Amino acid sequence: MEVAMSKDLQQEANLAKKRYIDLCRQGRIFDARNRIIGGDTQAWDFQVRDQKIKEITDKARHEAFAAEMKHNDKVMCMAHDREQRHRKQLCRAINDFQQNFQKPETRREFDLSDPLALQKELPARISDNDMRNTISGMQKFMGEDLNFQERRRFQKEQSREWFLQQHGEREKARADHLLAEHLHTQTRLKFDETARELMKLEGSTRKEVCAAVKAFNKNQVVELTERKRQEKQQEQEDNMTEITNLLHGDLLSENPRPVASSFGSHRVVLDRWKGMNREQLEEIWFTQKRQIQEKLRLQEEERQHSMDWDLRRIRKAHASLLHERQQQRLLREQRRALDCSNLNLARQQYLQKKQMNTASSSQPTEDYFSQFNTRSR
């Protein structure tokens, strides 16, 4: 039967503690899910922060585009409603004109399809002056017509009245047509003015969005630079504190003489003594200083590299903003040139149409009326 001594218990506890520390160390190094040793956590944090900033910027841009699309849809709906109302008014005016000035009773061929023609028809002969008395009807013979001159004068007056009436109707129709064209031109000009105002509003909105994005990026760059400076300063202070603690602690300034263990003179306490001489300690100190300098140099290179990338991003954003402004300026110039060309073309067409109307609307003279009914046949 074995008896557990205090030394054996102490040794067993130390071995269990060492095994536990070893298991914890294996978990920190070989666990792929929770391992942070050998990885750049600072770069991971920067990547996560950049991804969040990108998501926020994309969300703001999408919201701005959605608001702009909503505004454009509203303007298109208003323009569509205005055009529908104009079409209804034009159709109503056409219907009123047809009902008031294009009645079936006013047609020249209405007597051929008049349902009351039999009721309106006259007898075979009313008097000697009846115009329907022909030679074949034997109702009136040559020399018996005493109202020949009066009838001829009446025919001329009637033809004159008909012509004047037709001329007045044509003039009125031409005036109505010119008025409709004038209203159409005014409506088109109003639509063009509304489109120009919308383009100006769109340009100002884009300028405000670009200015906000530029200010946001500038603030982010300043904040990132200040944060890196503070982190670097804190890291340097922590490194100096760690170096000072190591230089003045028991780990590096311990007694070079071996500390005998309670289990024998050939044993030493591992957590207190490493068994190194003065030369080995100086070599370790020199290596540590060199590693510190190398780490500081790498950090400085990384900081310089980050500043270069930030400067490149700022320059690229500035160049893209300048390019977008140039494109907007070119679009405005093209739109202005197109408007001027359309206005000149409209003026030329209006002058040409006015000349044609003036040339085709001359007043008839007495010679024009005297050429009708010059003979008996």
Curated annotation (Swiss-Prot):
Its main location: cytoplasm. One of its GO terms (biological process) is flagellated sperm motility. Residues 217-246 form a coiled coil. It holds the Pfam family RIB43A. Signal peptide: none annotated. InterPro entries: RIB43A. Residues 354-377 are annotated as: Disordered. Keywords: Cell projection, Cilium, Coiled coil, Cytoplasm, Cytoskeleton, Flagellum. GO terms for cellular component: axonemal A tubule inner sheath; axonemal microtubule; sperm flagellum. It is found in: Cytoplasm, Cytoskeleton, Cilium axoneme; Cytoplasm, Cytoskeleton, Flagellum axoneme. PANTHER family: RIB43A-LIKE WITH COILED-COILS PROTEIN 2, RIB43A-RELATED. Microtubule inner protein component of sperm flagellar doublet microtubules. Belongs to the RIB43A family. Microtubule inner protein (MIP) part of the dynein-decorated doublet microtubules (DMTs) in cilia axoneme, which is required for motile cilia beating. This is RIB43A-like with coiled-coils protein 2. It comes from Mus musculus (Mouse).
